[in-house]
Structures are given as structure tokens and as C-alpha cells.
Amino acid sequence: MTATEQLTKKLIRVGHSPDPDDAFMFYALAKDKIDLGSYEFEHILQDIQTLNERATRGELDISAISIHAYAHVSETYALLPSGASMGDGYGPTLVAKKKFSREEIARKKIAVPGKMTSAFLALHLWLAD
């Protein structure tokens, strides 16, 4: 690649978590396994809540975000037709030292990965039933 070609590359900032599923999705870009043409990608690895917050400020060109956060950024970002980190047996999990009823859980203090995460939304919807 010539110096002129290097100067004309368009930089795209991509935010994703360091989790294995995101690492898999972005591996080919990060390791130069595909021809990027006139694009250059900067990988920004952060936790999902931080990525959600950055998306609300429009700081990244492309970003992994929670589906819950998408409701807050749908005017700025478009959903891609693939990619997801939830499914049967995978996704938000509530962990406790002993078993509690839903009513007991509703009265407990619960740690969540962020208020704009799918885990928080799922918990909120489950407790509201």
C-alpha cells in the first residue's frame, strides 16, 4: 500500500466487548483476515454498559449495544441483520446463595451490568409480571 492510499483510508471506530462472542464477530477485521479496501478499523473494547452510553452520545461509528439501549439510539444507529448474544441457555442469569421467590427477589438489592442492558430490562419485565 502506498503512502497516498494509507492517507485516504476512512477510519471507522468499532466498539465491542472483549467477550468471546464479540471477539468472534470482529476477529477477521481485527486480525486483517479480509481485504478492508479503503477502510481502516479502530477496535474499542469496553463493557456493554459503557458502549451503550457511548452510543447515546454517538461517539462510535459501529458498536455492539444491548437491545434495550437500541430504543434510545434508533434515530442514530441501524441494526445489522446479524449478531446477537442471547439465546436459550445464554444471556441474563440471576444468581443467589439460596432460592428466593419472585416476591422475595423483588425486595432484594440486585446488581446489574447497567440500566441500559438487556439483563436489566429482562429483570424489570420478569419482576413486573
Predicted regions and their residues:
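N-terminal hydrophobic or amphipathic helices and topogenic motifs
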Residues: M1-S85, G89
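Bilobed "Venus flytrap"/periplasmic-binding protein-like clamshell domains
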Residues: L7, L11-K31, P92-D129
